[in-house]
Amino acid sequence: MDASRASQLINSRETDVYCKSEPVIIRSVDEYSKMATVESLNNGTTIMAPLNDIRDSGVINH
């Protein structure tokens, strides 16, 4: 995922976002390092992940 798209999805629950197949919420994005802080929706843990590991489903939840 590119940094611009990741920034649009910060704290969003309207679009499903995944990091290595695990559902997450993007909490912050560092465009310089191309890393994002993500929180797991499964267990609440927060990790730093490369933007390349983050995908969105393209499905908007209402």
UniProtKB/Swiss-Prot annotation:
GO terms for biological process: asexual sporulation; sporulation resulting in formation of a cellular spore. HAMAP family: SspH. Keywords: Sporulation. One of its GO terms (cellular component) is endospore-forming forespore. The gene is sspH1. It comes from the Bacteria. Coiled coil: none annotated. Belongs to the SspH family. It comes from Clostridium botulinum (strain Hall / ATCC 3502 / NCTC 13319 / Type A). This is Small, acid-soluble spore protein H 1. It is found in: Spore core. The keyword 4Fe-4S does not apply. Pfam families: SspH. NCBIfam families: SASP_H.
